[in-house]
């Protein structure tokens, strides 16, 4: 093979593995990812990235105007969202959905639909790829896509016994993990975990729900092990927690690369891997 052609192919192979798009973000003190956006070329909004949804939404508590997003029955279709140099079209917004601190609304994974994308916590950016980038140092973890919501399995070591659970990736929750009622019931977590705080609420019918925060000694994701993980669960009459959450305080401890089909995610520890956990009130 001629040397010039060989050199061209080498350069080309390196080029296609590089990011086709990069989107800068910032991380709030509540562990949420925020991107600066302009919607419909008029409304400047800070949107929280919510990995647990595909569409976008506007918060009733927003501080900035969103007058150029026109809603009908709580839904607005056909919007254009500009983030940095990237323009995303036909974005659906929902109205009046609460979001994280400092944000005017949320934006989901729909802007990456059909593409490989990465969350790079080390460099505060999303990366979008046409082909899979280098996976050196990464480990493959099976991913389950349920109606646009992404789940992975992790092993919880409770009282010395490993127990598997499916976790919804939930970047809107600032803490470590939350257990579903189905997982927590019958496991005596308030006795087997070190409890760091609790709060009880009652509804108008007198039914109660108690939020308890504790410390899980070990959480294993693939071959990676996190220690002393902040873990929340609920007790009481009301059973409202349908899924276990892998929250933002765990998500940020890894860099993530999602395949285009959302069947596999590749993870490796980030600079936050051993950082102290966020304290939930």
Regions found by a protein language model. Give the residues of each.
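Bacterial Sec-dependent N-terminal signal peptides
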Residues: 1-24
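Pepsin/retropepsin-fold aspartyl endopeptidases
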Residues: 18-281
């Amino acid at each position: 093979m001629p040397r010039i052609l060989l050199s061209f192919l080498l350069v080309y192979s390196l080029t296609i593995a590089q990011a086709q798009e990069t989107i800068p973000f910032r991380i709030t003190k509540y562990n949420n990812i925020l991107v600066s956006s302009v919607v419909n070329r008029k409304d400047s909004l800070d949107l929280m990235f919510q990995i647990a949804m595909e569409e976008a939404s506007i918060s009733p508590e927003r501080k900035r105007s969103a007058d150029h997003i026109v809603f009908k029955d709580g839904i607005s279709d056909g919007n254009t969202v500009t983030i940095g140099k990237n323009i995303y079209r036909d974005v659906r917004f929902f109205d009046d959905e609460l979001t994280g601190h400092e944000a005017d609304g949320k934006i989901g994974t729909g802007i990456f639909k059909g593409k490989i994308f990465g969350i790079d916590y080390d460099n505060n950016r999303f990366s979008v790829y046409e082909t899979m980038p280098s996976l050196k140092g990464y480990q493959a973890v099976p991913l389950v896509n349920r109606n646009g919501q992404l789940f992975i399995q992790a092993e919880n070591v409770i009282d010395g016994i490993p127990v598997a659970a499916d976790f919804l990736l939930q970047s809107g929750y600032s803490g470590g993990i939350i257990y579903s009622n189905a997982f927590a019931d019958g496991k005596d977590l308030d006795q087997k975990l070190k409890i760091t705080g609790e709060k009880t609420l009652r509804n108008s019918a007198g039914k109660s729900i108690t939020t308890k925060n504790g410390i899980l000694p070990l959480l294993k994701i693939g071959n990676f092990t996190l220690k002393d993980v902040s873990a929340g669960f609920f007790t009481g009459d009301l059973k409202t927690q349908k899924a276990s959450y892998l929250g933002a305080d765990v998500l940020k401890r890894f860099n993530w690369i999602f395949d285009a089909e959302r069947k596999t995610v590749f993870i490796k520890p980030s600079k936050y891997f051993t950082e102290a956990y966020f304290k939930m009130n």
